[in-house]
């Protein structure tokens, strides 16, 4: 992700109604980054193989059918032998050590100097099961830390693994795919090493209708890792190679294939408008919207994330998502039983609301406000925060009539209640929204009615109390609202205060306190 903006930078997005639409659109990415910062990716970076076996030879036995158990010293001696059977026995034993579910001895195997010989075994085309065991062992070493993955890369494994993608032995080929996926998943450096070694055409050539589903899952996952990470992003050439395959994979029925294909697209759209354009121009949006209706959480989450990323783009890109039917689905997702989905849906809607007023009008046309208000009232706090951002964007860019509809939706009651929230940013944003709505009401000569409504909701008491908040910005914002919009009551309180002073009573300087 790009460098995260400071919280105050994000807050500026919502402060002034009438801010230029293009500027608000440019600032959308900060909202995306805020959500991404707080949430770990659900997709696995690396995977360790514990269960695979080579179909040509039983994995627990030697060629003579006798189970083998070797010490580390015997393994080292075996892998350095010129006897293929001894090499196989030693490599298989090392692989089994590396396949332990708990505490596999990755460091021990690396320090024993086994990687160079295992890389050599990848080239042993006369012994496919030796190739398989070596590829499996390297897969599991590459599933470890970046330092352990580096040992595999610097051992020269990438090119021989790519060559194994052309192996006639399906198990060997699939294991090579898995190893490359682990290497690419480590970060942009090794991802680019795999790309520049020309792995992508070989991976794409493997995709076929007759491919076993486990194999196709591994290919899709490896492709997603080739789309993953930034600083730098994957090169344009790689993206252009992979995109058609991802569109093809999105038509599959397997949820794991769909999930990883969607995650790949989410990585590709988590960037500049140009990168978003590369994806939306393929025509993928209608299919993504369909996948947003999936009952499988592992499909719904990345498809929703991808569409959410897309609407951080230009007005035109956002309109393409709307035209694809996004707003038919998002209001339903606000009512999903998973708070994580509610939050992502609210975030996506907040980015639509950051656009021009005709996008806000489409939000109203699809009746987004009722479920949003329900979340503000009853959602988990992390979801309420995202809903507040959406309301703030709405209020910042809305026309007068749209603001009236916002007030009529009942949004003020939960906003007033959230003024006691422990999150400084959220309180500041709510105060800005209230100020924005009051200013609009003043232009329509409706301020008195709105002030009465805010008073009935307990808003005046809460805003007055915030003048004493330990955060100076909150105190000043609250003071500004009271002075500007509830001036008559302020005049009465000043009269009472003067009477107290005349009677020589001790008093507290609230304005001074508010500025501390």
From Swiss-Prot:
Changing residue 152 to M: In OZEMA17; uncertain significance; decreased function in protein import into nucleus; decreased interaction with RSL1D1. Keywords: Nucleus, Protein transport, Repeat, Transport. The keyword Signal does not apply. ARM repeats lie at residues 103-143, 146-185, 188-228, 231-270, 273-312, 315-354, 357-396, 400-439. It comes from the Eukaryota. Its main location: nucleus. Residues 1-57 form the IBB domain. This is Importin subunit alpha-8. It comes from Homo sapiens.
